[in-house]
Amino acid sequence: MNWNGDKSIKMNLDKTGKSDKTGTTNKNSGIKPNVKYNDILSKLDKYKDENIVPMHMPGAKRNKELIELYMGDMGNPYEKDITEINGFDNMHNAETIIKDAFDEAAELYGADESWYLVNGSTAGNMSAICGVTHKNDVVIMARNCHISVYNAVILNELNPVYIYPEYDEEYGYYKGITLKEIKDIVDKYSSDHDRNDIKAVILTSPTYEGNVSDIKSIAEYLHQYNIPLIVDEAHGAHFNFSESFPQSAVKCGADIVINSVHKTLPSLTQTALIHINYGIVDVERIRRYWNIYQSTSPSYILMSSIARSLSIVKN
């Protein structure tokens, strides 16, 4: 066997599995795995066995009954972990089973188009922002946006104009953005610049603490000036499934909405969705960046997890 690195190392294993180098070997494989590589798994096993209530993501909360009832047939992921082979479509050029999954998600959320994200909402935010802007464009964004929004601003060399959401001193969190705050910042910018320079407004709603912005009124106002609204709704993937929740940004008229299905729905970590409403945005340009920011080896296990979690909430 050959390993190529700073130095070339050769190990000649005989039929018994013995090596001409020092160290222990396994008669079956010839090499004994380094136990240090299992430290992460061992720590996860210990955490699972301690029966700690998980007040954190993902949304399944390690609920044994939920997992057995709805996820049991997913089985051993290693047995189903594949790449783009015949009959299994291709996420980057979806035409059959994956295209059907996208269409089902769009129908469920009421979007014109929905696509899976296996690189988290991060990939969705970056695809959306880069897909509606060009170098040196102006965007209005809430100062409490996710770091992925800032990364997109940096990568596309954009000029951000910040909205500073009101801070609640009593509870220690930022409130949602109001229509008045949007109008004020647009008017302020337009007093010295061309309003047409504003290529997008980017908001986080709900916030991590659950505060929502007035998305419906904001979207209606911005659309008067042909300004697209991007909503990072990572923590609101569940909004669409009960009248007890705030209305989803998709149904409120936002142009692009990103949901982390792993945050509040029973899907695996780093799974998410991007939804698009037709009218203002260039769908194909967004798709181009969606392809750029997604892995070229998308996990079928993660995609299956998204499909299963949506099936659960639908039924």
Where are these regions (language model features)?
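N-terminal "arm"/small-domain region of PLP-dependent enzymes with the aminotransferase-like
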Residues: 2-21, 26-96
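Short intrinsically disordered, low-complexity coil segments enriched in acidic
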Residues: 1-2, 198
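Conserved PLP-enzyme active-site core in the AAT-like
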Residues: 37-43, 51, 69-71, 93, ...
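Conserved N-terminal alpha-helix of the aminotransferase class I/II PLP-enzyme fold
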Residues: 77-121
